[in-house]
Amino acid sequence: MNKIINIGLTALFACFMVACENDIDNYDAPNGGVHGTIYDKETNEPIPMPVPGSSGVMMSLYEQNTGATASVDFRARQDGTFEHTKVFNGNYRIQAKDGPFVGVCEGYVTVNGQTQVDLYTIPFSRISLDVTVSADNKLTLTYDAKTSNETLQLTDVSVIWNYAPGVDVNNANHATFSS
């Protein structure tokens, strides 16, 4: 009985090994990629993004002229840059979704190797911050917060900080100011 089980297991193992060496996957690995920055259309400054992760800005690549309906998704970084290094060469529409900007943020790119594509849009607001630290380690903050569009209204401005990079409202210390 053991001999039959051993022969069966050996045959099963041989089938698994042969299955791993077939030519079913006949596509070469992706040979292109995209990288770039999302800029403020009016100031040419990078637009800060939410912390990457489940709450970060989703970047989506839609392949054009192939009938493909699914997108290739990845996240933008907090400094407004983005990168995906494993994309097939071809024509794509790239879109930033659910970001801190007004309207649609998208562009078109022909990927041929590692390709740079920068996107330009209008942010919801422009916030400048000046921080000074006194000799006794006290912070003085001066900020200016303006909306980019008269129809938008700022209702709350918060200063948040953390000891590690990647601060957001879920992992920060807060100081809220009324305007």
Residue ranges and their predicted role:
Residues 43-67, 152-157:
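Short, ordered, surface-exposed loop/turn motifs in non-cytosolic proteins
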Residues 98-125:
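Structured interaction patches on ligand/partner-binding surfaces of diverse proteins
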